[in-house]
Amino acid sequence: MSFVIATFYHFVKLSNYYDMKDEIKVACDNVELKGTILLAEEGINATVSGERNAIDKIFDFLRSDYRLRDLTWKESAAEYQPFSKMKVRLKREIVNLGVSNLDTSVRGQYIDPDYWDDFISQPDVLVIDTRNDYEVKLGKFKNAINPHTQRFRDFPQWAESFSESKDLKVAMYCTGGIRCEKSTAYMKSLGFNDVYHLKGGILSYLEKTHNKSGNWEGECFVFDDRIAVDHSLAPSDKIKCIFCSSKVSTDELKSVPRGQVVCSDCKSLSIERKLEFNTNL
């Protein structure tokens, strides 16, 4: 059996998001979806997985709400169900930047994946990766700036210390688009004028371009049991252990915590070394 993995987000004011939780959970359970949906006043953010018919039905349901009628999503395939449960959670933010009263309606301009390579090749464009450091280590765009953040909440502090001219063009990207979209709103609030972001993120770029230019280097970390995907969006078979750099098997990948790609041999490391690693996440 094959499964469809759908990722989506939408920044839109949902004043009644508390009331939406139960009805969305019931709709997902009725079609046996698994995954996580986050709801906040600023919008919705989710990754869900199920059979083809289930995915179609849940989006018909969600888009019946006029505020979500423009909802779009990205799909990939898996041979196994990457999630064990269906969770619908209420949050202050759909992606946690930790900045109060940020107006996400004032944000950067989209760059379509088809034009991304040409855009970032311009000499006056700075490319910024808004993902966490452990994600960047698996793969990134050539010449992209790595802020070396351990979590998304670290990004504002890095951005405030960013010394480049606010008149330069800034092109930002992330996995699926949500972090870079919110980051552009923050950069705009700091006074950066020309701010852009990759529409749909790395996953859309790889889906549309198949990395023909070679600008993408490595694998793309994803937040499910696949751990990472290659340029064709297939589960990666090239992931290496963060301790010894040996290749990590598919079975081992299914059981690792987020950001901790560890082979079987290194799982027997001393407690002290594991604790040292964990404190750096």
Swiss-Prot record:
Family that this chain belongs to: Belongs to the TrhO family.
Function: Catalyzes oxygen-dependent 5-hydroxyuridine (ho5U) modification at position 34 in tRNAs.
Keyword terms: Oxidoreductase, tRNA processing
Keyword Oxidoreductase included in the entry's annotation: yes
Classification via SUPFAM superfamilies: Rhodanese/Cell cycle control phosphatase
Protein name (database record): tRNA uridine(34) hydroxylase
Gene this chain is encoded by: trhO
GO biological process entries: tRNA modification
Active site per UniProt: 174 (cysteine persulfide intermediate)
CDD domains found in the cross-reference section: RHOD_YceA
InterPro entries, alphabetized: Rhodanese-like_dom (IPR001763), Rhodanese-like_dom_sf (IPR036873), TrhO (IPR020936), TRHO_N (IPR040503)
